[in-house]
Curated annotation (Swiss-Prot):
Domain of life: Bacteria
Record key words, sorted: Ribonucleoprotein, Ribosomal protein, RNA-binding, rRNA-binding
UniProt source species: Mycobacteroides abscessus (strain ATCC 19977 / DSM 44196 / CCUG 20993 / CIP 104536 / JCM 13569 / NCTC 13031 / TMC 1543 / L948)
Keyword DNA-binding set for record: no
Gene Ontology MF annotations: rRNA binding; structural constituent of ribosome
GO annotation (BP), single: ribosomal small subunit assembly
Name the record gives this protein: Small ribosomal subunit protein uS19
PANTHER family: RIBOSOMAL PROTEIN S19P FAMILY MEMBER, SMALL RIBOSOMAL SUBUNIT PROTEIN US19M
Length: 93
């Protein structure tokens, strides 16, 4: 179930403060965060976030099409290694 509109989008305060400081100084440094749950707002456009995926920080450059989504959607936590090849020779034995 989606979040109620009267509550507004969830953004961690520390993340919003870091973006506001960079916007005031007109700098674009990578912002390291563990907050995968924060919603992307229009103030984030043009910034790069290093979103934690459980073992490392994945760089995510925010564009207009990402507004309204969560930061965690762009940093996958699972690595797909591919399906195991079917070995027919060993099955016959």
């Amino acid at each position: 179930m989606p979040r109620s509109l009267k509550k507004g989008p969830f953004i961690d305060d520390h993340l919003l403060k870091k973006v506001d400081v960079q916007n005031e100084k007109n700098t674009k440094q990578v912002i390291k965060t563990w907050s995968r749950r924060s919603t992307i707002i229009p103030d984030f456009i043009g910034h790069t976030f290093a979103v934690h995926d459980g073992r490392k920080h994945v760089p995510v450059f925010v564009t207009e099409s990402m507004v309204g989504h969560k930061l965690g959607e762009f940093a996958p936590t699972r690595t797909f290694k591919g399906h195991i090849k079917d070995d027919r020779k060993s099955k016959r034995r």
